[in-house]
Amino acid sequence: MKLSFLSLALATIFVMAIIYAPQMEARASSDADADAAASADADADALAEASALFKEILEKIKAKLGKK
C-alpha cells in the first residue's frame, strides 16, 4: 500500500470514529446542598489531617526534650 493511500485510510478511519462515537453531554450539578456538603467534608478532612500532623510534630518535640 502506498504511503498516500495509508494516510487516506487513516484519515477516513479517524473521521468515521469521530462521527460514530457515542455522544456525551456534561451537565452541571445544580444542587447547592450537595456542593456545600462536599466542601464541608473536604474542609473537615483537611482539618483532621492538619490536626494529626500537628500532634505528631508535638510528640516528636516532646520526645526530643525528654518530656512525656
Curated annotation (Swiss-Prot):
Q: Which residues form a coiled coil?
A: none
Q: Which residues carry this modification: Leucine amide?
A: 65
Question: Superkingdom, according to UniProt?
Answer: Eukaryota
User: Sorted alphabetically, which keywords does the UniProt record give?
Assistant: Amidation, Secreted, Signal
- Compartment(s): Secreted
Is-annotated flag, keyword Hydrolase? no
The principal localisation class reads secreted
Look up keyword Secreted and say if it applies: yes
Instruction: Give any Gene Ontology cellular component.
Output: extracellular region
Residue stretch(es) of the prosequence? 18-52
Give a brief account of the tissues where this protein occurs: Expressed by the venom gland.
| Signal peptide range in chain numbering | 1-17
Query: Pfam families, per this entry?
Result: Pilosulin (PF17499)
Question: Which family, according to UniProt?
Answer: Belongs to the formicidae venom precursor-01 superfamily.
Which purpose does this protein serve, as stated in its record? Unknown. Does not show antimicrobial activity when tested on S.aureus and S.xylosus. Does not show hemolytic activity.
Q: What is this protein called?
A: U-myrmicitoxin(01)-Tb2a
Per the UniProt record, the source organism is Tetramorium bicarinatum
Taxonomy-wise, where does this protein's organism fall, top ranks first?
A: Eukaryota, Metazoa, Ecdysozoa, Arthropoda, Hexapoda
